[in-house]
Curated annotation (Swiss-Prot):
The lineage of its organism: Bacteria, Pseudomonadati, Pseudomonadota, Betaproteobacteria, Nitrosomonadales. It holds the Pfam family Ribosomal_S10. Involved in the binding of tRNA to the ribosomes. GO terms for molecular function: structural constituent of ribosome; tRNA binding. The gene is rpsJ. Part of the 30S ribosomal subunit. It comes from Nitrosomonas eutropha (strain DSM 101675 / C91 / Nm57). GO terms for biological process: translation. GO terms for cellular component: ribonucleoprotein complex; ribosome. Belongs to the universal ribosomal protein uS10 family. The keyword rRNA-binding does not apply. Keywords: Ribonucleoprotein, Ribosomal protein. This is Small ribosomal subunit protein uS10.
Length: 102
Protein backbone atom coordinates (compact mmCIF):
# COMPACT_ATOMS: atom_id res chain seq x y z
CA UNK A 1 0.00 0.00 0.00
CA UNK A 2 2.67 2.52 -0.95
CA UNK A 3 1.82 6.12 -1.90
CA UNK A 4 -1.66 5.85 -0.45
CA UNK A 5 -3.45 7.63 2.31
CA UNK A 6 -6.42 6.86 4.48
CA UNK A 7 -8.62 9.82 5.41
CA UNK A 8 -10.58 9.36 8.63
CA UNK A 9 -13.37 11.74 9.56
CA UNK A 10 -14.84 11.53 13.06
CA UNK A 11 -18.19 13.04 14.02
CA UNK A 12 -19.73 13.18 17.51
CA UNK A 13 -21.91 15.30 19.76
CA UNK A 14 -19.54 15.00 22.75
CA UNK A 15 -16.07 16.52 22.25
CA UNK A 16 -14.54 14.32 24.98
CA UNK A 17 -15.51 11.12 23.14
CA UNK A 18 -14.23 12.37 19.81
CA UNK A 19 -10.88 13.49 21.27
CA UNK A 20 -10.41 10.16 23.06
CA UNK A 21 -11.19 8.27 19.84
CA UNK A 22 -8.79 10.44 17.84
CA UNK A 23 -5.96 9.74 20.32
CA UNK A 24 -6.69 6.00 20.11
CA UNK A 25 -6.54 6.03 16.30
CA UNK A 26 -3.30 8.06 16.24
CA UNK A 27 -1.60 5.75 18.77
CA UNK A 28 -2.67 2.65 16.85
CA UNK A 29 -1.44 4.01 13.52
CA UNK A 30 1.91 5.18 14.93
CA UNK A 31 2.44 1.85 16.70
CA UNK A 32 2.16 0.02 13.36
CA UNK A 33 4.62 2.35 11.61
CA UNK A 34 2.38 4.74 9.66
CA UNK A 35 2.69 8.53 9.51
CA UNK A 36 -0.32 10.42 10.89
CA UNK A 37 -1.36 13.99 10.07
CA UNK A 38 -3.87 15.39 12.52
CA UNK A 39 -6.29 15.24 14.20
CA UNK A 40 -7.44 18.53 12.69
CA UNK A 41 -10.50 20.05 14.39
CA UNK A 42 -13.03 21.16 11.78
CA UNK A 43 -15.64 23.85 12.54
CA UNK A 44 -18.34 22.78 14.99
CA UNK A 45 -21.82 22.72 13.48
CA UNK A 46 -24.42 24.25 15.80
CA UNK A 47 -28.12 23.62 15.16
CA UNK A 48 -30.51 25.75 17.21
CA UNK A 49 -34.20 25.05 17.77
CA UNK A 50 -36.83 27.38 19.24
CA UNK A 51 -39.89 25.71 20.76
CA UNK A 52 -43.00 27.39 22.14
CA UNK A 53 -43.28 26.82 25.88
CA UNK A 54 -47.05 27.00 25.94
CA UNK A 55 -49.32 25.09 23.55
CA UNK A 56 -51.97 27.82 23.61
CA UNK A 57 -50.80 31.41 24.30
CA UNK A 58 -47.62 33.37 25.08
CA UNK A 59 -45.98 33.36 21.66
CA UNK A 60 -43.03 35.37 23.01
CA UNK A 61 -42.14 32.73 25.60
CA UNK A 62 -39.90 30.09 24.01
CA UNK A 63 -37.37 27.43 24.96
CA UNK A 64 -34.11 27.31 23.03
CA UNK A 65 -32.20 24.08 22.39
CA UNK A 66 -29.03 23.39 20.45
CA UNK A 67 -27.08 20.41 19.14
CA UNK A 68 -23.33 20.78 18.61
CA UNK A 69 -21.70 18.41 16.11
CA UNK A 70 -17.91 18.20 16.53
CA UNK A 71 -15.70 17.03 13.66
CA UNK A 72 -12.09 15.82 13.47
CA UNK A 73 -10.08 14.95 10.36
CA UNK A 74 -7.00 12.69 10.20
CA UNK A 75 -4.80 11.45 7.36
CA UNK A 76 -2.77 8.25 7.65
CA UNK A 77 -0.02 8.34 5.04
CA UNK A 78 1.55 5.16 3.61
CA UNK A 79 -0.40 2.70 5.76
CA UNK A 80 0.89 -0.86 6.03
CA UNK A 81 -1.27 -3.97 6.11
CA UNK A 82 -0.71 -4.11 9.86
CA UNK A 83 -2.07 -0.56 10.16
CA UNK A 84 -5.26 -1.41 8.30
CA UNK A 85 -5.80 -4.58 10.36
CA UNK A 86 -5.21 -2.72 13.64
CA UNK A 87 -7.65 0.04 12.65
CA UNK A 88 -10.30 -2.52 11.70
CA UNK A 89 -10.00 -4.21 15.12
CA UNK A 90 -10.16 -0.91 17.01
CA UNK A 91 -13.17 -0.62 19.32
CA UNK A 92 -14.43 2.99 19.46
CA UNK A 93 -17.22 4.42 21.66
CA UNK A 94 -20.83 4.20 20.47
CA UNK A 95 -21.32 7.97 20.15
CA UNK A 96 -18.61 8.44 17.51
CA UNK A 97 -19.33 8.19 13.77
CA UNK A 98 -16.29 7.11 11.73
CA UNK A 99 -16.06 7.77 7.99
CA UNK A 100 -13.06 6.25 6.17
CA UNK A 101 -11.92 7.05 2.63
CA UNK A 102 -9.05 5.33 0.85
Amino acid sequence: MQNQKIRIRLKAFDYRLIDKSAVEIVETAKRTGAVVKGPVPLPTRIERFDVLRSPHVNKTSRDQFEIRTHLRLMDIIDPTDKTVDALMKLDLPAGVDVEIKL
